């Protein structure tokens, strides 16, 4: 595809980087071919795994494209990796070549990584002679393009095998609104599917991208205007909330943004979209699949992830894979009518792959419900569901309510065993600096927001909530620790909640 775009639009701008470097389609193709030849001269061949451990910028995109130009497999590493996590990923993928930032290589010292043989810290020093490149090896859409590592909350990171067709499909689904020649601002990392699919979409649409090192509330709008970006790689989680805190200005809507994919969409994010004058949509995605659920543009804030996109079939099932009636809660499973546009399994983990793909459907591990119109609503991760006195409780919903309490900075909610073999709700809270935190006031605040059985019995205050390498809270830590000596007990404090009698 890069060759095609370089032939059709050689002088069209394709890339802009934060350091001021730019590529046209032709200059990008020329550099990619030179690096591909340099890697080929160092015995990188089709199917080889090549680690790329670099921050966002020209070198990582150049490395990614050159690796794939040879048909080799791009294996990006999170720049936060260190210690045993880093050792596990390197050994699991089994690559022998790494392109790394020089400041990161000291983390390799002391690790047992016997298969890793060559580590290069200067991408430009590897540029070779493009005329000597052997590019005769065909690349098929079912070949593995990359291995993206996803952090689990209960076990080691798993490498998701992503074929070329999955990368293409994810790009055109997530950013299908991008028009020919438009620019996309990318502030997600290149070890994240949101980052790679954004660049792929720019290539598919003959557009351009502006890659910055990360999301910045203070620089976001300057970057949008500098790059004349009509969209971004997405506003995920609290990004929109952070941007909304800026003082309103008369020219807020005077910006080039036209449309954004946001996760989630609610009243606050819609107000944000209206304030800054862009259209929005949302959906559901994970590294393993190619955005199976999408809403219409400017859908109402009903909490829905939309409907299955064209070419995707979805079901909600029980623990035996039996489809459940609408309105009930079940696991989302999905499959495609075209092979290879979802993951090809977990690298080196045949049992995990078989579990995820059992009965010919990919099991997301997420609980959803479906309304009478066929729209899907996210409820919780299966392992994050709490069972209390016959009721299934969504930790996601309880966390959202607790976040509204003014003194809460971060929160995770887990189930802990109780005396009757089910669970009680534990809220682990990192409070904001300031006044002392009173758990009783939190319970009073939550009473009108949540069903009585959803309100936490236990509240524990912590200084930090541990995260995975991809910044997800490690809930398993608090499940394993259970009720600690510093945990506040609502019932011991004399606060008992009862079901309202009608």
Task: List the predicted regions and their residue ranges.
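Conserved AMP-binding/adenylate-forming core of the ANL superfamily
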Residues: 11-57, 61-65, 82-87, 165
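Gly/Ser/Thr-rich phosphate-binding loop
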Residues: 204, 226-235, 244-302, 313, ...
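Conserved AMP-binding/adenylation subdomain of ANL enzymes
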Residues: 168-183, 191-231, 245
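AMP-binding/adenylate-forming catalytic core of the ANL superfamily
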Residues: 81, 98, 314, 334-338, ...
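Structural core segment of the AMP-binding/adenylate-forming
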Residues: 37, 41-42, 65, 69-128, ...
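Short beta-strand->loop structural element characteristic of the AMP-binding/adenylate-forming
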Residues: 51-53, 60, 64, 68-99, ...
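Conserved pre-ATP/AMP-binding loop-to-beta segment of ANL
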Residues: 10-11, 131-149, 156, 177-183
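Conserved AMP-binding A3 loop
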Residues: 24-26, 145-169
């Amino acid at each position: 595809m890069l060759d095609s775009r370089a032939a059709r639009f050689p002088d069209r701008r394709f890339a802009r980087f934060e350091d001021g470097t730019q590529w046209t389609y032709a200059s990008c193709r020329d550099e990619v071919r030179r690096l591909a030849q340099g890697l080929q001269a160092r015995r990188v061949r089709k199917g080889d795994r090549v680690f790329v451990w670099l921050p966002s910028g020209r070198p990582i995109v150049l490395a990614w494209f050159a690796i794939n130009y040879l048909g080799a497999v791009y294996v990006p590493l999170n720049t936060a990796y260190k210690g045993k996590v880093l050792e596990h990923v390197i050994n699991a993928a089994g690559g022998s070549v790494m392109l790394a930032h020089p400041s990161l290589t000291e983390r390799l010292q002391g690790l047992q990584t016997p298969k890793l043989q060559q580590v290069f810290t200067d991408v430009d020093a590897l540029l070779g002679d493009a005329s000597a490149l052997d590019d005769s090896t065909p690349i098929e859409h079912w070949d593995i393009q990359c291995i993206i590592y996803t952090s689990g909350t209960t076990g080691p990171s798993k490498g998701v095998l992503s074929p070329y067709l999955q990368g293409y499909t994810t790009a055109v689904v997530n950013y299908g609104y991008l028009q020919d020649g438009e620019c996309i601002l990318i502030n997600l990392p290149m070890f994240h599917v949101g980052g790679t699919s954004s660049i792929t979409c720019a290539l598919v649409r003959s557009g351009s991208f502006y890659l910055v090192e990360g999301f910045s509330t203070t620089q976001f709008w300057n970057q949008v205007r500098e790059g004349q970006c009509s969209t971004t790689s997405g506003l995920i989680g609290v990004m929109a909330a952070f941007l909304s805190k800026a003082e309103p200005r008369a020219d807020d809507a005077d910006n080039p943004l036209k449309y954004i994919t946001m996760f989630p969409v609610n009243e606050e994010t819609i107000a944000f979209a209206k304030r800054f004058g862009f259209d929005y949509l949302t959906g559901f995605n994970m590294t393993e699949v190619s955005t199976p659920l999408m809403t219409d543009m400017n859908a109402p804030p009903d909490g829905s992830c939309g409907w299955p996109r064209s070419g995707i079939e979805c079901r909600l099932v029980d623990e035996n894979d039996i489809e459940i009636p609408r309105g009930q809660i079940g696991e989302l499973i999905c499959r495609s009518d075209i092979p290879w546009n979802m993951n090809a399994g977990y690298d080196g983990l045949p049992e995990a792959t078989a579990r995820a793909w059992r009965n010919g459907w990919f099991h997301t591990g997420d609980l959803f419900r479906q309304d009478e119109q066929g729209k899907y609503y996210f409820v919780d991760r299966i392992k994050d569901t709490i069972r209390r006195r016959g009721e299934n409780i969504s930790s996601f919903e309880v966390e959202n309510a607790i976040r509204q309490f003014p003194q809460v900075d971060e929160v995770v909610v887990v189930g802990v065993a109780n005396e009757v073999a089910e669970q009680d709700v534990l809220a682990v809270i990192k409070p904001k600096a300031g006044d002392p935190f009173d758990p009783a006031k939190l319970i009073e605040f939550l009473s009108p927001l949540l069903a009585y059985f959803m309100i936490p019995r236990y509240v524990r205050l912590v200084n930090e909530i541990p995260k995975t390498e991809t910044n997800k809270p490690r809930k398993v830590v608090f499940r394993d620790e259970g009720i600690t000596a510093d945990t506040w007990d609502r019932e011991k404090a004399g606060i008992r909640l009862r079901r309202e009698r009608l």
